[in-house]
Amino acid sequence: MKKLTSLLMMSLTAGALLSGCGKNEPAPAAQSGAAPAPAPVASKIVIGLDDNFPPMGFRNEKNELVGFDIDLAKEAAKRLGLEVEFKPIDWSAKEAELNGKRVDALWNGLTITEERKQNIGFTAPYMENHQIIVVPANSTIKAKADLAGKVVGIQDGSSAVDAVQKDAVAGSFKELKKFGDNVTALMDLTTGRLDAVVLDEVVGRYYTSKKPGAYTVLDDHFGTEEYGVGTRKDDTALLGKLQKAMDEMKTDGSAARISSEWFGKNIIK
């Protein structure tokens, strides 16, 4: 009887031990410090531009986007292995377009200024520019001081606005009239609704060359400035890649070749 009782107790104890060993343990919790999935690699770059800014970026007779900056951007994108999309934007809202991530870069005669540097990352300058004064060929305006009492046209949101407003002569204008683009301002100059237009030299020289004898470019201007490519301040990776591509294009002569095709000479800085 004692043996039977002992055997029974041993059997119950072993069963309890086996039951305890077979208990399901909760699955270990996932480690909170796991590395996030890598961000997808970009295959395309979206360039924001003013599509009425010849010869930097504009539409030809076939409505195709062409221009000096267009060709530079295409060459840079090719070297980076990226598809390039050119997106016309309201140039006066360019910083909002860029920082709202609707475009990746601004590449269209973008002047480097200290104010813009607060919100935009810039490549090194690739071109020098002046804010020139264009008047009709028969105008009595011969110098900057002669703009007193005159109606002067300018592109809204352009660096010309800052350049003019910083000059004391601006206070003597009858009116500083702002336009959506330079071409429209020049058309108003032709029809007599403006006395003068202040605009980027590259645009003014290109436009006036198409209508010889119609305009005069004054010797006076509103200052010298430089063009750069702009990206978001925090997108240092893209900025570095664009700078590297531009440096290579300068070194191997590609930038000079593109410049010669548009301006007849190398004006790359």
Locations of regions flagged by a protein language model:
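Acidic, polar ligand-binding/catalytic clefts
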Residues: 74, 78, 83-146, 216, ...
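Bacterial lipoprotein signal-peptidase II cleavage site
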Residues: 18-31
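Extended ligand-binding regions for polar small-molecule ligands
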Residues: 22-24, 70-79, 145, 151, ...
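Extracytoplasmic small-molecule ligand-binding "clamshell" domains
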Residues: 32-109
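Ligand-binding cleft/hinge of the Venus flytrap
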Residues: 57-59, 73-82, 160-179, 208-212
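Periplasmic-binding protein-like
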Residues: 51, 128-135, 183, 201, ...
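A ligand-binding cleft/hinge motif common to bilobed small-molecule-binding domains
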Residues: 110-118, 165-167, 188-191, 195-223
